[in-house]
A protein has these predicted regions:
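Contiguous, well-folded functional domains in the mature portion of proteins
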Residues: 1-261
Length: 261
């Protein structure tokens, strides 16, 4: 199996960065997913990973590429995990320092509501009452607000801390719970001045999809980078507060740093 993996990985040499290749290698070796499935996985990376595709995605970006450290990219993952210029990052963090909660990532808001009715989180794969019971296991109750955020492929995929506080836990959620179908799920739990805040990171089902830049018991400031998706499409923020004071609107596009409360 290991020989097959290495042979297939050679086919994407120079297509994805070394760190990404190693992450995928580690995953497929641990999962024993089989030769044919592995081949499909690699071919999927190859098909997505073309210079023309990158150029198309750049044109689709709603924000200026001048915000980023690089405007030209060697491969798709180089584009997908691009970093903001330090001056732009500092500007966003400075504008957010007196805010309670911010948008943690570039997104379109799919839904906003209260956990007493999560039916508008449109990609939940289980009945709402069952999802609530699952989330109660990690400390979420039906008095929380939620913001459900969609990340498109052209978007900036670094994720930043939506609040200032202490990282209480980084929880991988078993796919057996199937909150988001077979997709992977991490929950970041914060202790803050406004109570516990939860950030759900929903990734692609077949790959190791999130690299953390934080650890449990670490104190973070609002806007700090907490990690990046290697492949992912959804985040959900859960927090308490006056629902009527939430500043963002459903179906609108937002960049990281926009004020929620």
């Amino acid at each position: 199996m290991e020989k097959i993996i290495y042979e297939l990985m050679e086919r994407v040499e120079n297509k994805v960065n070394e760190r990404y290749v190693l992450a995928k290698l580690k995953f497929v070796k641990s999962q024993n997913i089989g030769k044919e499935n592995l081949k499909k996985l690699i071919e999927g990376f190859q098909n997505r990973d073309t210079i023309n595709n990158i150029k198309k995605k750049i044109k689709m970006s709603p924000v200026s590429m001048d915000w980023y450290e690089k405007t030209e990219f060697d491969n798709f993952m180089d584009f997908f995990t691009r970093n903001l210029k330090e001056t732009k990052l500092n500007e966003i963090k400075e504008n957010s320092k007196n805010t309670k909660i911010i948008i943690p990532n570039e997104c379109v808001i799919e839904s906003i509501g209260k956990t007493s009715d999560m039916s508008s989180i449109i990609r939940l794969k289980k009945p709402t009452n069952t999802v609530i019971e699952d989330l109660k296991q990690v400390g979420v109750d039906d008095t929380y607000n939620f913001v459900n955020m969609k990340l498109y492929v052209s978007y900036y995929h670094n994720i930043h801390s939506p609040v200032s506080g202490k990282i209480v836990d980084l929880m991988p959620i078993s796919k057996d719970l199937r909150i988001f179908g077979k997709n992977s799920l991490w929950i970041v739990k914060y202790n803050t001045k406004i109570g516990n805040v939860f950030l759900l990171l929903v990734g692609e089902s077949t790959i190791q999809d999130f690299d953390f830049n934080i650890k449990t018991n670490q104190n973070v400031k609002i806007g700090d980078r907490i990690g990046n998706f290697n492949w992912g499409s959804q985040t959900v923020l859960l927090f308490k507060g006056d629902f009527e004071k939430i500043k963002i609107k459903k179906k609108n596009h937002y960049f990281f740093g926009e004020h929620i409360l």
